[in-house]
Amino acid sequence: METVDTSQRLARLRELMKERNVDVYLVPSEDSHQSEYIAPCDGRREFISGFSGSAGCAIVSMTKAALSTDGRYFNQASKQLDNNWLLLKRGIESMPTWQEWTAEQLEGGKVVGVDPSLITASDARSLSETIKRSGGSLLGVQENLVDLVWGKDRPCRPSEKVTVHPVEFAGKSFEEKITDLRKELEKKKSAGFVVSMLDEVAWLFNLRGNDIPYNPVFFSYAIITPSTADLYIDEEKLSADVKKHLGDKVSLKPYTSIFEDAKALGQSAQAEVNGGASDPPRKFFISTKASWSLSLALGGANKVEEVRSPISDAKAIKNDTELEGMRACHIRDGAALTKYFAWLENELVNKKTVLNEVEASDKLEEIRSKQKNFVGLSFDTISSSGPNAAVVHYKAERNNCSIIDPEAVYLCDSGAQYLDGTTDTTRTLHFGEPTEKERKAYTLVLKGMIAIDTAIFPKGTTGFSLDTLARQFLWKEGLDYLHGTGHGVGSYLNVHEGPIGIGTRVQYSETPLSVGNVISDEPGYYEDGKFGIRIENIIMAREVKTTFSFGERPWLGFEHVTMTPLCRKLTDPSLLNDAEKKWINEYHSEVWEKTSGYFAEDELTRNWLKRETQPI
């Protein structure tokens, strides 16, 4: 991982701040749609700080600069940040939050500036209150200052073609989805909903794009009212097939006209109030993740209502077609991973081939690309050997990566986009003789993964409540990991999908798990500079039968869909109880049954799979 000298960039940014009377400038990670993964043109935080992780916030004052990120990226950030930057480790008690650190810089009534399109309206309000208590004020700076520093070197905004996602994969027409949304809006007496999240627009209209790497979304907004459906998108992105798909049920408008139209809607609502309507005027809804800019355009906090997105909740509960697609694509994807691991072991151990991390991941992509319905990867493959496996979101650079050491742990976290689903699988392997500590760590992580997989819980339980099941065995040894245990997964959409998850984030306590949720199960353990362990399966929430039904509530459990062998060499059977051994043996029997047919004429892979799925 290379460190970028940010001195000149910071100096130029501070010049621009001074010209605009801004004392502290915030650079969030997100784009104007609050996307977790962004297009290169929106990589402002990475440009100004040198840190390339997917989460974090940069804060620049006239004399200092700080970068806040979470536990997934502590190791990576410490390597990528140069001496201009202070690393604020989120969640560490001795460290201030980035909001607290910002407030500490504000003595004497200073001004904090931020691009209002890059933070949510609710975050702007809470940040403003924090800043006020320190004597400062928050200013929305319409012109993005990092863009000015970046200048002509900033990548252009993508404008890739949009495609139709057929109902044979979506399971429901876009007309039905809009009808369902309108019913929800009517229940809440809303004038309409402004859709700002890219995956929500894609899901609602059964469309997919390619504007953000690995995420099949496209730059757009939408406004849905009781009688209209407007899609804000650059029309050159739309083929004749897409226009035919939308028909006369959707009005197409330029992407950049959303704020002008939002302002007009806000003024119309205000005119209704001024006209003394007998009924309370209906407000437009925006998601709690919508930008401060969008809220201001609609008239601000008193004129617009921020709500949990009804689209986000609907999208998280997969229909039967989507669930069947997830099962099918994970079998094919599991076969691809099995072929890759068999190939990799043969190259490293039998042929003594020298392979680096990128060469290996290239081979995996080649194998995956031959699978039915393959579209592309769902994220940048994490192919990490030895100490690199301790970097949770490690990225091997093509011209600067490690040779895979057969005598060290190898962690591979990878996934793909298929027309019928999205995959995300992590396996940790060893091609030599693992140490006792590596085997123990792996087995403790495996026990946690099994505990989530086999959990049974009453309807209404959240992922926040389940999280300790995955950590309990590590905790007994005084060990832990600094990332969530699971995230929601889209259906040929974003591999990280809200609002559900398993972990300690506040939002995971707000959304109960429901039948049809698709979520990852991925505990881990990492020792900086030594090795890392992570095991990840994708699981789907379903209703289960129990002997009793306390409170007459439905009870839920999980169905795993990932079909890839676990690592026998790293598993210590002496640390497993009988139920866990039974689970592993039954899982491996299922993997063999569902994937071995792919290798009828591939003796190498078939033999590897047979060996790895033998009972323990």
Curated annotation (Swiss-Prot):
Example of a GO biological process term: proteolysis
Cofactor note: Binds 2 manganese ions per subunit.
Keywords: Aminopeptidase, Hydrolase, Manganese, Metal-binding, Metalloprotease, Protease
UniProt: Mn(2+) 2 binding residues: D413, D424, E536
Catalytic activity: Release of any N-terminal amino acid, including proline, that is linked to proline, even from a dipeptide or tripeptide
InterPro entries: Creatin/AminoP/Spt16_N, Creatinase/aminopeptidase-like, Creatinase_N, Pept_M24, Pept_M24B, Peptidase_M24_C, Peptidase_M24B_aminopep-P_CS, X-Pro_aminopeptidase_P
EC code(s) of this entry: 3.4.11.9
Family annotation (CDD domains): APP
Positions bound to Mn(2+) 1: D424, E522, E536
One cellular component term from this protein's GO annotations in UniProt: cytoplasm
Any single Pfam family the record assigns to this protein: Creatinase_N
GO molecular function: metal ion binding; metalloaminopeptidase activity
Required cofactor names: Mn(2+)
Top class in the EC scheme: hydrolase
Domain of life where this protein originates: Eukaryota
Protein family membership: Belongs to the peptidase M24B family.
Record's function text: Catalyzes the removal of a penultimate prolyl residue from the N-termini of peptides.
Protein name: Probable Xaa-Pro aminopeptidase P
